[in-house]
Amino acid sequence: MSFKFNAEVRSKQGKGASRRLRHNGQIPAIVYGGSEAPVSIVLNHDELNNAQIHDSFYSDTIILVIEGKEISVKVQAMQRHPFKPKLVHIDFKRV
């Protein structure tokens, strides 16, 4: 199964901005690795939450579309809420 998600570059950083994103149904994330600089992005929570149910989400290559550019990544780390079925933050590593 292949996964493809649309992402936006984050303009505001910090705890308050991240909380506002989560409250609006989005997840802060970061893409790093390779020769390019790390990029902070925002993803739709519901799309990722539905995709992370599949085992292949953690092992297969994921395509992120950031500003019209497709980037191949894999999940490096994922933070979940302690008792709610919600994602808090995701780290992606370029492939």
UniProtKB/Swiss-Prot annotation:
Official protein name in the record: Large ribosomal subunit protein bL25
Keyword rRNA-binding: yes
An MF annotation (GO) of this entry: 5S rRNA binding
The keyword RNA-binding is assigned to this record: yes
An annotated GO BP: translation
Classification via Pfam families: Ribosomal_L25p
Key words of the record: Ribonucleoprotein, Ribosomal protein, RNA-binding, rRNA-binding
Binding partners and assembly: Part of the 50S ribosomal subunit; part of the 5S rRNA/L5/L18/L25 subcomplex. Contacts the 5S rRNA. Binds to the 5S rRNA independently of L5 and L18.
Summary of the function given for this chain in its UniProt record: This is one of the proteins that binds to the 5S RNA in the ribosome where it forms part of the central protuberance.
Family the UniProt entry places it in: Belongs to the bacterial ribosomal protein bL25 family.
UniProt cross-references to InterPro entries, sorted A to Z: Rbsml_bL25/Gln-tRNA_synth_N, Ribosomal_bL25/Gln-tRNA_synth, Ribosomal_bL25_short, Ribosomal_L25_dom, Ribosomal_uL5_bac-type
NCBIfam families reported in the protein's UniProt record: PRK05943.1
GO cellular component annotations of the record: cytosolic large ribosomal subunit
Region spans: Disordered: 1-20
